[in-house]
Amino acid sequence: IEKGETKILPLVLDLTNPSSSLGWASQERLSLLERGPADTILALALIHHLAIANNVPLDRIAHFLKSLCHSLIIEFVPKSDSQVQRLLSTRTDVFPDYTRETFETEFQKHFFIERVIKIRSTERYLYLMRGQKT
């Protein structure tokens, strides 16, 4: 790595509607899927937005994230969390499968869970996962 250079690429995008390839012959700016897979993705405060706010099932989230990276650091935010309660305050809770147990079951189809840390003073958990060979 050149001095002062990092290999960190922060991306801000709507994962439920990612941009396609752009530019001449669709080759100047590659789509998110074409850029990867990344070594590691850091996904904090994300899962509840995809699952609760955007109705994306946990199995689809796990499959998609596996297509983007080799390893994953992801935070699970339970329904009891104030931010999830805020998302649910304007709608009926139709998410019986949004549980930590289901999260682990679905993600273990694509990743090995290497470490789980409970975040102090919260009900949130941080997971380190490594992708399974497919």
Task: List PLM regions with ranges.
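Core SAM-dependent methyltransferase catalytic element
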Residues: 28-30, 115-134
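A short, conserved alpha-helix within the catalytic core of class I
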Residues: 20-26, 49-65
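Short alpha-helix
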Residues: 93-111
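S-adenosyl-L-methionine
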Residues: 1-36
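Conserved beta-strand signature within the Rossmann-like core of class I S-adenosyl-L-methionine
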Residues: 61-83
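Structural signature of nuclease core domains in nucleic-acid processing machines
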Residues: 12, 17, 61-64, 110-113
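Flexible glycine/acidic-rich beta-alpha junction loops that bind and position SAM and/or redox cofactors
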Residues: 19, 77-90
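A conserved beta-strand element that flanks and buttresses the S-adenosyl-L-methionine
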Residues: 41-42
